[in-house]
Amino acid sequence: MLGGLLTSNGAAFSPDGRTFYHADTPTHTLRAYDVDPATGVLGDGRLFHQFEPGKGRPDGGTVDAEGCYWSALWDGWRVVRLSPAGEIVQTVEMPVQRPSMIALGGTDLRTAFVTSAGKDLSDDARAAQPHAGGLFTFRVDVPGIVQPGFGG
């Protein structure tokens, strides 16, 4: 079991099941861990991506069929797609400050579903983003994957 985390979000596995990703939201960090697919045991973790403070914090996430990790950036007004090397390769701007989770679904797994939050927004911020708390969709070029069930 992982310890020393403040708030863990965005849990997802790579398409081959050999890498586990998660976000430690308060520290602006995405981490990756090698996984033994036979036992499910996690190896040592490594920094996957460090977001700059003030540019959004990684919250919910998912992985697509190319092994890229998608992250919703709380207080960041966007979702990003990161390569397996941890580099941002795509940014999708959102009309809300707090995207909270992204999932890839639909019949072809090419529809992105992004939830958002309106929590603790000032009256002015709420007026500027009346759809905060809503669900948004957009199409992606690379389909998602069905995440494996957790056996532990």
Q: What residue ranges belong to the model's regions?
A:
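Short loop/turn segments immediately following beta-strands, especially the blade-tip
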Residues: Y33-V41, R139-I145
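Conserved beta-strand positions in repeat-built beta-propeller and related beta-rich domains
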Residues: F20-T27, Y69-W74, F113-K119
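Beta-rich, blade/repeat-based domains predominating
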Residues: M1-T19, F51-C68, V96-R110
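A short beta-strand motif characteristic of beta-propeller blades
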Residues: M1-G3, D44-F51, E87-V92
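Flexible "stalk/tail and boundary" regions
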Residues: V80-T91, Q97, G106, A112, ...
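Structural signal for beta-propeller blades
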Residues: H28-L30, W77-V79, D120-L121, L135
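Blade-level signature of beta-propeller repeat domains, shared across WD40, Kelch, NHL, RCC1
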Residues: A103-G152
